[in-house]
Regions:
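Bacterial N-terminal signal peptides that target proteins for export
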Residues: 3-25
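Hydrophobic helical h-region of N-terminal Sec-dependent signal peptides
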Residues: 26-30
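C-terminal motif of bacterial Sec signal peptides marking the signal peptidase cleavage site
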Residues: 32-35
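A short, solvent-exposed, low-complexity linear motif enriched for acidic/polar residues
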Residues: 37-260, 267-271, 275-329
Length: 329
């Protein structure tokens, strides 16, 4: 082989080597690109908001009808932010027994920190044993009366889910606002009223108001109810019934004052400023239905002002109260 041929051969070999190296470089670059893209995709997937364990409970504010022994509802599904409680089975609850801070666990789910977007309760026409009705009142005579209407309740309240915490969402199914009676029949109030009748709170951000009245007889009634309002939101018109037959409809929550010891408890009040009002009721015509008698004048034995006091999270406001009679009499 002469020098020219040898040179040409070497040149060809170098060209082939460079071509192969170029191809290898392109292949390695492609592999690295795909790998980086997959990593980026995984990072994007993993950067979604971290979820927090959240327990969901249900409770009730008392119904103020003397002829009602108990109220049952059947919950078939619970959704928060579109997520259903996993493993939830249709449950029939004696909702009227869940007063004075008593709750029943509906289940648990994982939620991202921040404000909830929607909370939905699904009610069933049949009970947990697939017998009807699923939602009903038991009267003092033992009769079971079906509660008409309502299969889905979209709760208007939003709840803040706190990051890195064991959150407890409490749904306050206020029967006093949720039910209406027409003769011997019972039904849920209208959809819009019902949505505003159920509160949703995170118990981590709530407090309690408790109290003792030393002279309930001064209220001159069969039953006295304590109503908690956001400060400045009580008006005289609250004593009149709305279109659904509900009075004190804008109260945040309420509690009957015990006729035997004068005690009352209002639980799951979100931190903030409140005012407290007392109303007297009597069954004037012995029909089992309480009629509003009047507002009760009340004083406290402490420096706490009933027209404006603060409830803080994880705390209790205790009130020692004396009644001085019905207002306006």
């Amino acid at each position: 082989m002469n020098l020219t041929n040898a040179f040409n051969c070497a040149q060809n070999c170098l060209c082939m080597l460079f071509k192969n190296l170029s191809r290898l470089g392109l292949l390695l670059g492609l592999i690295l690109f795909v790998s980086c893209s997959e990593d980026d995709s995984m990072e994007e997937t993993n950067t979604g908001g971290e979820t927090n364990a959240t327990s969901v409970y249900i409770t009730d504010s008392p119904v103020d009808e003397t002829n009602v022994e108990a109220v049952f509802i059947t919950v078939s599904e619970v959704k928060i932010n579109g997520k259903t409680i996993e493993g939830f089975n249709k449950t029939t609850l004696e909702i009227s027994s869940l007063t004075q801070g008593r709750t029943e666990l509906l289940g648990e789910l994982e939620l991202e920190a921040g404000m909830t977007s929607d909370i939905t309760l699904m009610l069933s026409e049949t009970d947990a044993s697939e017998n009807g009705p699923g939602n009903y009142v038991v009267t003092n005579g033992g009769e079971k009366v079906e509660i008409g209407s309502a299969s889905q309740i979209n709760v208007n309240d939003q709840v803040e889910i706190i990051g890195d915490a064991q959150n407890e969402v409490v749904l306050d199914f206020d029967l006093r606002k949720s039910l209406k009676q027409d003769g011997e029949s019972y039904s849920f109030v209208s959809e819009s009223q019902l949505e505003n009748s159920i509160r949703a709170v995170n118990s981590m951000k709530t407090g309690i108001v408790t109290g003792n009245v030393d002279n309930t007889g001064e209220a001159d009634g069969d039953v006295v109810v304590a109503y908690a309002y956001k400060k400045g939101e009580f008006e005289e018109s609250e004593t009149s019934t709305n279109s659904e037959g509900v009075n004190f409809s804008n109260a945040v929550s309420s509690s009957a004052v015990s006729g035997s010891n004068g005690e009352f408890e209002i639980h799951f009040l979100e931190e903030g400023d409140y005012e407290l009002h007392f109303a007297s009721y009597s069954d004037e015509n012995s029909d089992g239905k309480l009629e509003f008698s009047g507002m009760v004048e009340a004083d406290t034995a402490s420096s706490i002002d009933l027209s404006g006091f603060t409830v803080e999270a994880n705390s209790e406001v205790n009130l020692q109260i004396s009644f001085t009679g019905l207002l306006g009499l």
